């Protein structure tokens, strides 16, 4: 009986095939990993985590996690959608300093091509700010993020959020309210993908 169970497990393993997991075209279609499946349709909807460092071959950017979701399988390639990003907890802890203020915001925005994204920007001041200054900075962060999203398509906005251009735009304006040490987009989450979103390109 034991031999039959082992044989069935071996036969099931042999029936599975390897699939490469590919990032979207605007992330250079980088191969971010591989997985096995007996039925490729079971891969669709699975989330995969990688880092900006792995996507760009720049290991200094491994503190930024990128979340992808498999949307289709073509041949031995599993294509993906970008579902968001998040800075590692260790990285955030490393930039928190005593006697300073941390200002967080949480805002849902809509891009001009209809994607709804939850964005979580964070500011760190040089010294401790007053509550009125913190509120003014928070309101400015929300205003800038909403404006940039409304003016951008999904790909452009997410690249700006992940690669630092959006945080730089916040820094340039908010520093006049109170001196800032750093601004980060701590996290993004894709809440809604429009029905008219283009289908993934074939490999």
Curated annotation (Swiss-Prot):
GO terms for biological process: translation. One of its GO terms (cellular component) is cytosol. The lineage of its organism: Archaea, Methanobacteriati, Methanobacteriota, Stenosarchaea group, Methanomicrobia. GO terms for molecular function: structural constituent of ribosome. The keyword NADP does not apply. It comes from Methanosarcina acetivorans (strain ATCC 35395 / DSM 2834 / JCM 12185 / C2A). Keywords: Ribonucleoprotein, Ribosomal protein. PANTHER family: 40S RIBOSOMAL PROTEIN S3A (PTHR11830). InterPro entries: Ribosomal_eS1, Ribosomal_eS1_arc, Ribosomal_eS1_CS. Belongs to the eukaryotic ribosomal protein eS1 family. This is Small ribosomal subunit protein eS1.
